[in-house]
Amino acid sequence: MTHFVAIFFSSLFMCSNVFAGSVSSVSLGSLSSALNERMQVMKAVAGYKALHHLPIEDLPREQVVLDHMLQNAQQAGLEPHSVEPFVHALMNASKTIQYRYRADWLSSPDSAVPVRDLTETRQQIQQLDTQLLTAISQRLMTGAFSQEDKEFLMSHLTAPHLSESDKNSLFASLSRIQRQH
């Protein structure tokens, strides 16, 4: 009888490890996809701001984004205070990408500047932010972010104008996010 109990528990342990690994890989894929898409949307934001002669940095809007993400973080089961540095890193990378696009357009004035309605673009960004927080929460259910996770994300974050230092800043703040207790 003890032999069967040992087999049962070892099978249960193996299944939980397989499940945890699959959740981890799925959530990392979702995380990298949402991050890439969010960074790619910055081209449209930069285009709108360039066309309407708006500054890239918009501190009141950043506060709205921060408040919204912290509220969503709590709903996703994350500790909001631990998410705040990630949100700042995300917004800084987003602004940096916008500046890089604006610089490209200044040096190549004939290039087409994409223009979309900013309200629609912001709705898309909010949806992506929710996806990001959900993927982070799911990943943290299996444990903290690892070096392998960093390598995966660094190799899969391929959005134009996202530099290695941007990626490092994002991952450093991402690795400090915690689930609520």
Swiss-Prot record:
GO terms for biological process: chorismate metabolic process; L-phenylalanine biosynthetic process; salicylic acid biosynthetic process. Substrate binds at residues 38, 49, 58, 62, 98. GO terms for cellular component: periplasmic space. Residues 21-102 form the Chorismate mutase domain. Catalyzes the Claisen rearrangement of chorismate to prephenate. May sequester with cyclohexadienyl dehydratase and an aromatic aminotransferase to form phenylalanine or phenylpyruvate. Homodimer. It comes from Enterobacter agglomerans (Erwinia herbicola). It catalyses: chorismate = prephenate. The gene is aroQ. This is Monofunctional chorismate mutase. Its EC number is 5.4.99.5. The lineage of its organism: Bacteria, Pseudomonadati, Pseudomonadota, Gammaproteobacteria, Enterobacterales. InterPro entries: Chorismate_II_sf (IPR036263), Chorismate_mutase-related (IPR051331), Chorismate_mutase_periplasmic (IPR008240), CM_dom_sf (IPR036979), CM_II_prokaryot (IPR002701). GO terms for molecular function: chorismate mutase activity; protein homodimerization activity.
